[in-house]
């Protein structure tokens, strides 16, 4: 989870490769569609087979925006692995999220995909993924990668 007190933006990541970008609203909004951004990190990786759970189903259609945090974009990353790291650049409105398979950067203002980068081995040996647990060091690397990318876009 990441919260920016200046902009009122809240970004919440989940365990099925999804994260939601919300803005703080002082009034209830009209019914609206929330844009869904999908990103597949491993389409170009031969031999990769995801054996985990399926992504969450996202409810289609407009819904009433309540008072408080209102969703502005929903991002679904495939494979649907847990979101390990989130970063936000208020000056550019960029949101970065990292998983065990790579990272995604979206434009939080226009709700579009900016970049998706797979961080899996180029050799195609994915057998380590079967029972691989992410260590604190790996989480730190993902978080630093997100921060570095956002820093150099400023």
Cite the ranges covered by each PLM segment:
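A short beta-strand motif characteristic of beta-propeller blades
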Residues: 72-76, 112
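Beta-propeller fold detector
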Residues: 31-59, 63, 114-128
């Amino acid at each position: 989870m990441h919260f920016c007190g200046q902009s009122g933006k809240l970004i919440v990541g989940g365990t099925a490769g999804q994260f939601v970008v919300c803005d703080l609203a002082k009034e209830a909004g009209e019914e609206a569609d929330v844009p869904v951004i999908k990103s597949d990190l491993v389409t170009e990786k031969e031999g990769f087979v995801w054996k985990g759970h399926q992504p969450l189903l996202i409810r289609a259609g407009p819904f009433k925006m309540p008072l408080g945090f209102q969703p502005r974009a929903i991002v679904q990353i495939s494979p649907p692995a847990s979101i390990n790291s989130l970063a936000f650049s208020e000056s550019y409105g960029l949101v970065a999220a990292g998983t065990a398979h790579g990272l995604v950067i979206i434009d939080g203002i226009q709700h579009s995909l900016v970049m998706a980068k797979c961080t899996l081995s180029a050799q195609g040996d994915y057998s380590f993924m079967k029972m691989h647990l992410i260590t604190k060091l790996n989480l730190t690397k993902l978080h630093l990668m997100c921060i570095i990318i956002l820093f150099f876009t400023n």
